[in-house]
């Protein structure tokens, strides 16, 4: 008779202990141990893919392995193909995470429905077949080779994969799938670990690419053990504010491509639309004559685009001035305010400062520092920045404007959108042929020089 025993498993890293521990000794997190019942079965009784290979796998010499370029599946979505590094590699396991309701299932379903000539199996553990049909009708795409399976038992899913023989497998979501090998509830650390390991083995043995949809926890990371992110080939993060129409697909881990890629979508009633030129959507046309607005030439991933930086500076009503930043690091904004006071002589100690990156984007590019302090100073002086001016540059603690990377892409993007002048760091044009650029390029060394160019 198989015996069951109780163990405590860390929900963050997957470490186990025979008794409850307040602080995990492996990852250092507090209060992450949860109780689970584990049933140890004989190896021969396990029916999962790859749990027991029966000694069939043998080591081979590295020189005997033929090296071939990996075959990629074109998903028909330029943004998704870009983030994946040119398409989906056969036999790869891709994890897509994001907040509830952000559009993960919509993104995957419309991609599957848009595929032609590929047999796909969409396994849903959260929605019924009728609910998926309603979603598919709203997207208005149709794939005659798309099979729908509403099942959460992993053993039954593998039975159906043998019958269907799909070219692409989608599982929505990994937290709803369970295996009979582990006696614990779906979504537990043990279930997620065992199921993901079995799915990985299926992908490698059959050569079928698999897309996993995963939930995120309150900290914003993928729910479940960290081993889930380690065993998959690619981790994609689908993010965005539900109050805005834009969604951003980022690559956190990619064994077959760059993690610097970025995909941008626009959420519509009929699904997600690819945004090939995000600058035209992120810039408004009605800010002329308004103070506190500066246009920054930013790069997210390897894509250049222009963003609108908005600032509001007002007298502090309460004793302690308020500092608020949306889409920008608050600590970095406080550092830039200190630079404004120390190096440029502008006193903002008794002022409330509010900063916003228009469009609901979260930007980590330090090259927008110059636009941030320019927008803040513009609002403080109540002087608008002349239309047609864009800028980029990192601001150092001594008030210097430091060079930024990919300056050519930033300049060409600003010129393409009709800007007549761009302010950039000094000596940032090495190797760039300015003759192919018609816009005026102004180079500055210090923040004071930039302010003289903007406000006279």
PLM regions with names:
Residues 99, 125:
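P-loop (Walker A) phosphate-binding loop of NTP-binding proteins
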Residues 2-12, 16-82, 89-95, 102-112, ...:
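Peripheral, non-AAA+ core regions of ATP-driven protein-machinery
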């Amino acid at each position: 008779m198989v015996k069951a025993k109780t163990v405590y498993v860390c929900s963050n890293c997957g470490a186990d202990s025979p008794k409850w521990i307040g602080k995990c000794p492996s990852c250092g997190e507090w209060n992450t141990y949860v109780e689970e019942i584990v049933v140890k079965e004989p190896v021969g009784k396990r029916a999962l893919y790859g749990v027991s290979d029966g000694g069939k796998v043998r080591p081979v010499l590295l020189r005997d392995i033929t090296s071939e370029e990996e075959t990629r599946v074109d998903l028909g979505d330029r943004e998704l193909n870009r983030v994946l590094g040119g398409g989906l590699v056969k036999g790869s396991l891709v994890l897509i995470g994001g907040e509830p309701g952000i559009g993960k299932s919509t993104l995957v379903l419309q991609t599957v429905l848009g595929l032609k000539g590929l047999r796909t199996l969409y396994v849903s553990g959260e929605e019924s077949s009728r609910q998926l049909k309603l979603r598919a009708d709203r997207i208005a795409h149709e794939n005659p080779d798309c099979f729908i399976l509403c099942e959460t038992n992993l053993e039954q899913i593998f039975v159906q994969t043998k019958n269907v023989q799909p070219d692409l497998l989608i599982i929505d979501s990994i937290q709803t799938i369970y295996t009979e090998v582990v006696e614990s509830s779906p979504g537990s650390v043990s279930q997620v670990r065992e199921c993901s390991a079995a799915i990985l083995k299926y992908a490698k043995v059959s050569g079928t690419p698999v897309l996993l949809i995963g939930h995120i926890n309150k900290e914003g990371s993928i729910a479940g053990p960290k081993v889930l992110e380690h065993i998959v080939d690619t981790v994609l993060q689908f993010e965005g504010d539900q109050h805005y129409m834009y969604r951003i697909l980022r690559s956190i881990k990619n064994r077959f491509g760059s993690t610097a890629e970025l995909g941008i979508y626009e959420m519509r009633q009929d699904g997600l639309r690819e945004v090939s030129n995000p600058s035209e959507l992120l810039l408004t046309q009605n800010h002329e004559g308004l103070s506190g607005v500066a246009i920054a030439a930013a790069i997210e991933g390897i894509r250049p685009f222009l963003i609108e930086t908005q600032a509001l500076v007002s007298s502090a009503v309460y004793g302690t001035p308020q500092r608020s930043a949306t889409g920008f690091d608050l600590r970095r904004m406080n550092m830039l305010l200190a630079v404004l006071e120390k190096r440029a002589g502008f006193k903002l100690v008794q002022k409330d400062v509010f900063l916003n990156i228009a469009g609901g984007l979260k930007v980590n590019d330090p090259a927008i520092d110059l636009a941030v302090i320019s927008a803040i100073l513009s609002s403080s002086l109540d002087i608008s920045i002349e239309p047609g001016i864009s800028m980029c540059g990192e601001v150092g603690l001594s008030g210097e404007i430091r060079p930024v990377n990919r300056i050519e892409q930033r300049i060409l993007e600003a010129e393409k959108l009709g800007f007549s002048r761009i302010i950039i760091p000094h000596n940032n044009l090495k190797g760039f042929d300015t003759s192919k650029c018609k816009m005026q390029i102004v180079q500055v060394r210090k923040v004071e020089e930039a302010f003289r160019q903007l406000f006279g």
